Amino acid sequence: DEEITCQENLPFTCGNTDALNSSSFSSDFIFGVASSAYQIEGTIGRGLNIWDGFTHRYPNKSGPDHGNGDTTCDSFSYWQKDIDVLDELNATGYRFSIAWSRIIPRGKRSRGVNEKGIDYYHGLISGLIKKGITPFVTLFHWDLPQTLQDEYEGFLDPQIIDDFKDYADLCFEEFGDSVKYWLTINQLYSVPTRGYGSALDAPGRCSPTVDPSCYAGNSSTEPYIVAHHQLLAHAKVVDLYRKNYTHQGGKIGPTMITRWFLPYNDTDRHSIAATERMKEFFLGWFMGPLTNGTYPQIMIDTVGERLPSFSPEESNLVKGSYDFLGLNYYFTQYAQPSPNPVNSTNHTAMMDAGAKLTYINASGHYIGPLFEKDKADSTDNIYYYPKGIYSVMDYFKNKYYNPLIYVTENGISTPGDENRNQSMLDYTRIDYLCSHLCFLNKVIKEKDVNVKGYLAWALGDNYEFNKGFTVRFGLSYIDWNNVTDRDLKKSGQWYQSFISP
């Protein structure tokens, strides 16, 4: 077998598309980009969702600039421009999400369907297919109809399971003949921990001692309940698809946010143990039920009665409820032991892993190049680790029975206060993307991991959760004073030549 060499740190030379390009991958491998509804569409023509509610109620949490998704890049009006970018990239895949409140404005299908919203997605999907671009469609990318949050606190209540199923049923009915890749819920870990634990995300529930501005919540218990209902809602939808829609010939699965974890001190058994706990609490929390029908034993032991349990029927429903996994990967962290003050009033579910996470290890070594600079405090800077994508893919193959995998997000931001010229010359993004693609190619070739596609985040600059417009993630540039155009940045031109060498 050929030995593939990938650099772990700067300066990267993988930007040379003569050496690394799409022909390094199998001929059926899909390359493209990703987006989500709240971040790109704008509010025109849809019902309110919890990100509308959250960003207006807590503008300081929506971004340092108080930015929100009210208009953003207005892809509701300019979706054809999005397709033009994909066409220019020669992309063969595009991941986007359907806004639940655009097609069912009041959350429950029984309250009526918005035909104009359905027409919007029909237009987008057929436009993609005309250009030979495969749609990857996310049903839920965090933008729950506000009515369902108001009525029963959304995923905190089991009522969500049937409402989500009815919404998915409508999507399969309308779009299933054209859509062959469905993603149920984006980043299963995120809404429970960020929406109901730290309250950094919508709906913004937490214990009063965690953040006094939270309108209600319990950061120690609610994340586990929300995660449990997400798993059941996901599984119910997969079951529906398999019972009623297999004739459409598509595949369905969840999206996981992944990280890799390394010991803060690799000679210290406590750091090593903390690292293993993080893998179970971050990945196993969802992959345990999805593969074995049960939560990891370490979680059962640690969380105790705060962790819901599955009935035998539920366990069977959740177990094996995916045809493929969408894996998002951005960075890796060092783990060291940290106390878990279960009985304190400011306890959160995220403390249960008993780990503190950093980007610098015991010997003062940074894990890799700068990912994102923290304006307020440089000790909060994030650093990235391209080899982490290799480790994550290898881990999923070995621990979770060699699943079919699509990388559904991978990308890096640049500062939003750069001028247009600086933003267009985004060489840091080329470094990030090419170094991860090198390690992705390496793990496929060396470990025979079943990865069949890579979708970079993001198609264009957009509203970033918690950051507003203070960062840019796009491979194409959007001028916030005139959002009609999307211009390929250097990284977009690089990706274009990577896809079509």
Curated annotation (Swiss-Prot):
Keyword Nucleotide-binding appears in the UniProt entry: no
Enzyme class of the recorded protein, top EC level: hydrolase
Residues binding Zn(2+): H56, D70
GO CC list: vacuole
Binding site for substrate: Q39, H141, N186, Y330, W457, E464, F465
Classification via Gene3D superfamilies: Glycosidases
Role description: Degradation of glucosinolates (glucose residue linked by a thioglucoside bound to an amino acid derivative) to glucose, sulfate and any of the products: thiocyanates, isothiocyanates, nitriles, epithionitriles or oxazolidine-2-thiones.
Subunit structure: Homodimer.
Protein name: Myrosinase MA1
